[in-house]
Amino acid sequence: FYGALCYFISLAIPPFNSEGFSFLTLLERMYPGNWWFLMEYIVLILLSPMLNKSIENIDSKTFRLYIILLLIVNVGIGYCLNDRVNKTGYNIMNFIMLYYIGRFLNRNFEQHVAYLKRKWLWLVYILSSAMLFIGFIILSKYMDSTRIALKWFGYNNPLVLISSVAFFLIFALTKMKNSVVINTIAASTLVVYICHSSNFSMSPIIRAIFAKVNGWYDFPLSYVCLLGYAIVVFAVIVGFDVSMKTIIRKVKLIFK
């Protein structure tokens, strides 16, 4: 639905409507394979019964061994050695590793997680995120290597994994006062991904607008602008998705 919607919106904007309407293009943009994350997520769901079976009756020691082996393959061999088995983490191999890590933390929450202090997790998250940011600045500006700079944010970069797990644990240890708001936003994050990513959706429009805004600022401030722009895009898409769901619910009630 959102792939088609983004296509029709792009048709209404002259700079992105050079070829006119094409039914084949419409079908192509509705195909989930255009978004790597969505396709890998679907595959992970299909594999989840098998993955659950593989860890159903194993002890924590064996479970840890599984995760260590996956880290060696995905991070050590894939990312650090730049092997084609998993160079960037944008594939099902990395999803399986993250799935195992999540299941391990869930199964051993009281033993390995419950005693952790959120302030130390925040420190780990901030430090790892800062190292990612500084590394990107150095690689992109001072070493002038866009390819390596983009690889720096690979999903199997150790710093990305550390910051992600720390952030996940912070939320796992936080008692939410208004879980309805959190759940509503979480339910719309996939729509944000579909609308903002890939050349098959709104990505060209978003990039063009940001390129124009980015040109108004010097380099240091451009990253602040990027953060603000990302927040605005996220808020607009989430707001639109929530509105669409409300309208659809009301329409269903009318025809019920």
Segments from the language model and where they lie:
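Interfacial loop-to-helix transition and helix-capping segments at the boundaries
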Residues: 25-40, 79-98, 133-165, 222-231
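Transmembrane alpha-helical segments
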Residues: 43-47, 51-54, 97-109, 160-175, ...
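Solvent-exposed interhelical
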Residues: 45-70, 104-124
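Loop-centered beta-sheet repeat module
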Residues: 62-110
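Membrane-proximal cytoplasmic C-terminal regulatory module of class A 7TM GPCRs
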Residues: 204-218, 243-256
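Hydrophobic core of alpha-helical transmembrane segments in multi-pass integral membrane proteins
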Residues: 7-11, 67-78, 123-140, 164-169, ...
